[in-house]
Amino acid sequence: MSSRTSTSSYKRMFGAERQAMVRSTYSSRQYSSPGRTTSRVSYSSASSTSPSLYMSKSARSATRLATETLDFGLADAINTEFKANRTNEKAEMQHVNDRFASYIEEVRFLEQQNKILTAELEQMRGKGSSRVGDLYEDEMRELRRQVDQLINEKASVEVDRDNLGENIERLRQKLQEEMLQREDAENSLRSFRQDVDNASLARLDLERKVESLQEEIAFLKKLHDEELAELQMQIQERHVQIDMEVAKPDLTAALRDVRQQYETLASRNLQESEEWYKSKFADLSEAATRNSEAVRLAKHEANDYRRQLQSLTCDLEALRGTNGSLERQMREMEDNFSIEASGYQDTIVRLEDDIRNTKDEMARHLREYQNLLNVKMALDIEIATYRNLLEGEEYRITTPFPNLSSLSLRESMKEIRPAMDSLSKKVVIKTIETRDGHIINQSTQKDNLE
């Protein structure tokens, strides 16, 4: 009764009885290469006819043999040995059932863990990688946009710098021309100053000559006056003598003629001296006026050149200041651009590290999942093996045995061994190729081993 109850409960738990016992082995190998991982999973199973059939056949033959040749004197000893064997088998079955229950609990726990890890892996595949990839792409687009903007700004600043450089070069050339013109004006001014100095010296010389001539005229006039005075005195003395001497000739007309001649000569000399002085003074005045006008024009041009030079110097200083400020701004922009580019590069490296870490984490989860799957498959194989063993044992236990001799049991075991030796073996080789944590190829190969 207990045997039937255990059989029905086993059928409710594991299904109908199997008439074939499966012996399976499992092995897994992984070959890794850069960027590619190959997993090779091998299954070997052996199927044969259940030993219970051989046992039933041997039991039938033993029954016929026992009915024909059984010695009733040994029945009690055989029954006692059979009861002891049944007790030992029950204890072993209880131990096997306990181990089987623990294996079932462990398998359930591992299946739950496998489901959790599978859900996490699917979530990471569905959301994590896409979210990180989208963030990476958005960040890269933003960085590229900023880099393009900075490149455009740098190009515009370089164009402005080139334009300012051209303006500075043009102003420098203009400054050189103005400086040459200033040097020419200064040379002209120096020549004009030399002419003015020469004219001044000539004027001073003429003034001295005029003074000397005036002094000479004054001296001659004084001398003339003195001579006239002497002549008048002589004339008076002679007039007195003439008055006293009646017979002396009349000298008045001669003196008058001499006086007129001297007066005419003196007036002519004075007039010529005045005309010569006036002409010389006019020439000197005209030369001085002309030279003063040239000096005034030269001074005016020099002042104009000085003002232009000052304005150009101010413009040059302003342009130098503008150029210096633009160069400082350009250096600051280049420094900021270098700093931002290095920051963007660090961000890119950090994002690549995050992506690499995420891929490594996914690969690690895949490896764990693969390991758990391997463990699950090994446990499934072991459970199937235990199930087949339990089915065989339960079938053997529930089969009614009459009182048998030890000879019949030995013969039945001898019949089972050849049957076990004649098992056919099948090897299943499953190859899985992964790259960056994703399965890219999967193949299965079956081989039969004798």
Curated annotation (Swiss-Prot):
One of the most prominent phosphoproteins in various cells of mesenchymal origin. Phosphorylation is enhanced during cell division, at which time vimentin filaments are significantly reorganized. Residues 255-393 are annotated as: Coil 2. Residues 118-139 are annotated as: Linker 1. Residues 140-231 are annotated as: Coil 1B. Residues 82-117 are annotated as: Coil 1A. The keyword Coiled coil applies. InterPro entries: IF_conserved, IF_rod_dom, Intermed_filament_DNA-bd, Intermediate_filament. PROSITE patterns: IF_ROD_1, IF_ROD_2. Residues 24-38 have a biased composition (Polar residues). Residues 24-56 are annotated as: Disordered. Residues 394-450 are annotated as: Tail. Expressed in low amounts in retina, optic nerve, brain, and spinal cord and in very high amounts in eye lens. GO terms for cellular component: axon; cytoplasm; intermediate filament; plasma membrane. It holds the Pfam family Filament_head. Residues 1-81 are annotated as: Head. GO terms for molecular function: structural constituent of cytoskeleton. GO terms for biological process: intermediate filament organization. Keywords: Coiled coil, Intermediate filament. Residues 89-397 form the IF rod domain. Residues 232-254 are annotated as: Linker 12. Coiled coil: none annotated. Homomer. Vimentins are class-III intermediate filaments found in various non-epithelial cells, especially mesenchymal cells. Vimentin is attached to the nucleus, endoplasmic reticulum, and mitochondria, either laterally or terminally. This is Vimentin beta. It comes from Carassius auratus. The lineage of its organism: Eukaryota, Metazoa, Chordata, Craniata, Vertebrata.
